[in-house]
Amino acid sequence: MCIRDRPYVGAAAFSHKGGLHVSAVQKDPKTYEHINPEKVGNARNIVVSDQSGKSNIISRLRSIKINIEESDPKIKKLLDEVKDREFIGYSYDGADASFELLARRIIGEIPRYISINEYDVSDKKNKSWEIVSSAKAQLEVDGEKIMCEGEGNGPVNALDNAIRQNVDRLAKYSKYLKDLKLVDYKVRILNTGTEAVTRVSIESTDSKGKNWFTIGVSTNIIDASFKALIDSLDYKLFKDKAPASL
């Protein structure tokens, strides 16, 4: 696969963002594309952002096999939600899994899986003066509450471990989550000051070699990480057709 930002042939060369721009490309790709992307091993990418119009949303929905009438009011609701979220720091360009979850939640296609009622993360120094992060999380499946604990290299890793290391206790979902791994974690500070907004991006993978990307935004880095992590779990469960929680 070509490097994303490589001139002429990179994936970014075939990304389309503005609403009118996307509408024109759908009618005639030659209006904005210098070459068929498939000729250089790439594909057309319709970006969903605060500049998006209905054309962007409909194109993205079709690409993930969501069939919905163009006149359905849920399309406008999704478009407004995307713009509101972009305003506070979200960016769905490169976070396809989080966008799909958002779209399916608004349309009503995502069931409830694991509810996380509360969580707590703390740091401490051990006898070797190494910082160790610990996390506790109360999970709920089918009305049963389960307290999970874990440690890790940093608060996000600890929270991830608290959930996944106790997956055997989640009999209903253990077989779906056992092979889930976080392979990349990125943090971006969107503004300055003590109330700076943080955007966290997580890349996940499974034993089938599938990769997906999720995002979380908050003034608290742990909360932003938590949102991205939960999206990763929900996406895996949805794609593997896991049963809903009762």
Sequence positions of predicted segments:
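Mixed-charge, glycine-accented linear interaction segment located at domain edges/termini
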Residues: 209-246
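Short alpha-helix boundary/capping segments
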Residues: 49, 147-155, 213-224
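Generic long, charged, amphipathic alpha-helical segments
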Residues: 170-206, 215
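A short, contiguous, amphipathic alpha-helix enriched in charged residues
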Residues: 3, 153-173, 177
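A mid-to-C-terminal "edge-of-domain" accessory segment
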Residues: 4-147, 192-197
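Glycine-rich phosphate/pyrophosphate-binding loops
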Residues: 64-65, 70-73, 168-182, 236-244
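Terminal-proximal interaction/regulatory segments of ATP-powered molecular machines
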Residues: 148-156, 162-163, 201-208, 226
